[in-house]
Amino acid sequence: MIDGDRYVMAPLTASRSVCEAFHPDRSHACIKEYSDDAAYPSYRYDDGLYPLGFYHFHHLFAGHNVERSAWHMRVANVVILLILIGAITVLSQREVRVNIALAALVAWTPMGMYFIASNNPSSWAITGVFCYGAALYAGLKARGWRHWALLGVACLSALLCYESRGDASFYVFVASLGILILEARRRHLPEIGVATVLSAIGVWLMLGSGQASSASQSSDATITVHDRIDVAFTNLRYLPDYFAGFVGLNSGPGWRDTSLPGYAPVVALLVLGFVIFLGARAMSWRKALASIMVFGAMAGIPILVATPTAFPNLGAYHARYTLPLLGVLLLIWVSSAVKKSSLTKGQFTFFVFFLSVVNAVAMHTTIARYVRGLLWIPHIGWIAPVNLNGDIQWWWADMSLSPMTLWGLASLGYTLALTSAIYLLRHRQVEAPVSSTPTEEEEPA
């Protein structure tokens, strides 16, 4: 205890790991002033505000070298995503694979990928919510042992949600409701039962989480109902800007202190708009109702939560808190639209090019932010130096590649992976279409 506040002793490099925060012109070189051998009181510790699983799991990778430990934790988070997405891809039908790939790429480029590979609980929240929705969606369409295997993947994904954030636990309920409205039929009673149990667990964990308790205990009698209504209307007007934060607009990497060039979020929004129009090619009352329900949660939760005294307004409520639901919404929205699509090679080319540009620019800016800091240009704002190797002030100790080389290889790898995925998905033999006339067992539940 120090002056009545509880602290824990942590390595100095961990306590000062964000020494450049809110100073875009500073690189991460400031961490060199501190040592792994020295300890310092830190107020950032497990006080019950977040679920135990995420931090207890990552504690397994904590070692004397803080930088190496952070590397191991990031790699573990990416591996978890690859295992879950890989399992869903292998077990699902071709049409489902296309929908899942499209929804994930658009929802996660660029900010989702940044958070998934981070040391933040949002990594598990984004991975868990989307993989849960995708596995449940694929499971409802699968048959035989693949069907049960996908339900198992859904359970594992829900576990990630439970152990990451309280709101992610609640998102299991939102995703379940959306996917079941879209696809559930009478023959899906076992799946409905599993989803209901997982959703009930999620709601129960959310209500008992430290985040919910903290929000409820932060009420202040001086905040009147009129004040809360005013803030709610302000939040409603700010909602489009908040949604644009999903692609990095005013809500970039770091602690929202790394501004992406304006054209990156704009291009990402163009791609998102393209997918919205693509999904509108095929509509049904189920799809409309499921989309409205998930979108309502994405809009309603931030508006209601981001009020005094928990938050001054929606501007203080990070977009990453709601980002996990974007992938589920897009998955619902593009369902039954991809197979009806008649996209040309030119349209696919623009899709790959635009996403590749967004990914490359976001990576370049983020690397520059920590390697040498951003440059302030009057009347323009913060920009990243073009040459990442020009003034290397900090870089990963065990990284043999230079910043520029790593950026080039990662950007090229993203483009090649995206191109290959589209080629394979387009040229695989199309499965025999299912009759559009519902049988008795396919009637709505």
What are these regions (language model features)?
Residues 150-166, 171-177:
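Membrane-interface alpha helices of multi-pass inner-membrane proteins
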Residues 138-141, 169-199:
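Perimembrane helix-loop-helix junctions
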Residues 182-185, 203, 215-228, 347-445:
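Transmembrane helical bundles and short interhelical boundary loops of multi-pass, membrane-embedded
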Residues 89-110:
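Transmembrane-helix signature of polytopic, membrane-embedded enzymes
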Residues 57, 206-280, 388-411:
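Membrane-lumen/periplasm interface segments of multi-pass, membrane-embedded glycan/lipid transferases
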Residues 72-96:
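Transmembrane-helix motifs of polytopic, lipid-linked glycan transferases
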Residues 117-125:
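Short acidic/glycine- and proline-prone juxtamembrane loop motifs at membrane-interface regions
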Residues 1-67:
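Interfacial juxtamembrane loops and adjacent helix segments
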